[in-house]
Amino acid sequence: MEYYNYYSANAHRGDYDIGFKVDEMITRTRYLVSEFIGAKENEIAFTNNTTDSLNKIILGFFENYLSDGDEVLLTKSEHASNLLPWFELKKRKNIVINYIPLDEDLMVTVENVRRSITPKTKVISIAHVTNVVGDERPIKEICSLAHDNNILVVCDGAQSVPHIKINVKDLDVDFLAFSAHKMLGPTGVGILYGKEELLTKFKPLIVGGGMNVTFSSDGNVTYSDIPFYFEAGSPNVAGIIAFGNSIKYLNEIGMEKIEDHVLNLRQYAVSKLEEIEDIKIYNKNINTSIITFNYNGISSTDLALYLNEHNICVRAGTHCAKVLKDELGINDTCRISLYLYNNKEEIDYLIQTLKNITY
């Protein structure tokens, strides 16, 4: 509200005090994001969401980087946002998409990654934490293995950055995408991180104001340096400023405390869910925020609607990971997503509500 009330101006355009204030606040958020994940400020570009970031990475960089016959490694537990852009790229270029096998617990192992690499493999695009199984992938080890074989790594961090202390330099990941709205921030703000030397090799996907230095009527254009090169048009100023405040709040609490709280709550929830005979948990031994389950004889949608009547919000369906059903052997599930604002009393209420089911 402060932005709208006191300095509601556009960014990077105004030669007046409220414009300078907007530029200062956007720079502040960029700095906070860079510090939060251990990156340089010019390696942080603002986007609309994780989906937008992944599309820009895949179609803005890899369309030029990959050649016919090059192979991309994915997994069948990826979110649509880390699959569909690759499918689109495959329509434009003669690339090959292969899938890293999942183990019996639907997890990715370094050994399975190693076995999947061929001389043609050029990129591994993988979630750090998946949004259905909730498994945390060994990204640092995968990056080390990939780089030993001259392979780049794209990381979908939508489910990990809000929950786990991340340092991109330590992980050595080449690209990382995540969203503000999963970490107490507003919708409509995403982050594209990339190593500086890679970001300078992107082709522009969206062009216009704010991302050029000069252009002339004959079509000659000089584009801005990174990260402004990725930020054409008027940005979501209010959202970006708010995201900076969200990061400050998370830092004040401490990511380690958040992770401990969520894991303790998850263990408690799983132990209580196991008391209900008709509940099947698909990711019992995972140490992240996600619990995926079904209730015997009730569709996931019907269960979610029943819980909604009691003011309990769970996600039902395929969770945008429609290929995973081939591995799970079922079409849909219910998903509980825990965060720092949840508590044991809420878990107890959920369990009692589930125990009250009669049919």
Q: What is the meaning of each model-derived region?
A:
Residues 1-359:
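Pyridoxal 5′-phosphate
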